[in-house]
Amino acid sequence: ALFALDNLWDGLGALAIERPNMKYFFGKMTMYPEYNRQARDLIQHFLFKHFEDKEKLVTPVDPLKIETPVEYMDSILTETEFKEDYKLLNAEVRRLGVNIPPLVNSYMSLSPTMKMFGGGINHEFSEAEETCILISFDDIYETKKARHIDSFIKEKVAYIKKRFPIFVENMGENLTDMVA
């Protein structure tokens, strides 16, 4: 699963290079109905707390019904800082016998300004519970950009060297210097 996530992030890095006018990534995180309800509600509550869409840009057509009392969730998620609150979330989710889904975990650590628009039920995809998000490319942590964009550029240069040897001869070391 983690290798697949790396491929996903490398793909987003490629999009950023191939489509430099792209400012936002709009997508979703998926959890399935079998996932622990209380853990799901706690994750949703955490996402609202730290990534709420205050402008109400998007709303789900068929929103998730949060079944866990807000008072309970507030008693668990007591920190104002993301990192400290995340530790509390992770501990409680594990206590409930599950882990935070890897994709959800990855998105939460991608950008401090991610917007979460709420979760909804996708009736056309096995009743999957999908949470809509928006990430500004400019706000993605530099370490994440470097890791996934650099790999794309290196792969692109390797491809050019192999596919167009005459171009490489004409460019000489300049092509290598472009990615060094």
Language model features: what each stretch is:
Residues 33, 48-49, 139-141, 154, ...:
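Short, intrinsically disordered/low-complexity patches at protein termini
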Residues 1-114, 118, 125:
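Acyl-donor binding region in acyl/amide transferases
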Residues 152-180:
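Short, cationic low-complexity segments
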Residues 68-74, 146-148, 163-171:
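Short, highly charged low-complexity linear segments
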Residues 42, 132-134, 159:
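Alpha-helix boundary/capping detector
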Residues 98, 128-132, 138-140, 166, ...:
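Extended effector regions of multi-domain proteins
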Residues 12-14, 49-54, 141-146, 156-161:
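Glycine-rich loops and low-complexity Gly/Arg-rich segments
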Residues 104, 115-153:
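C-terminal/domain-terminus segments
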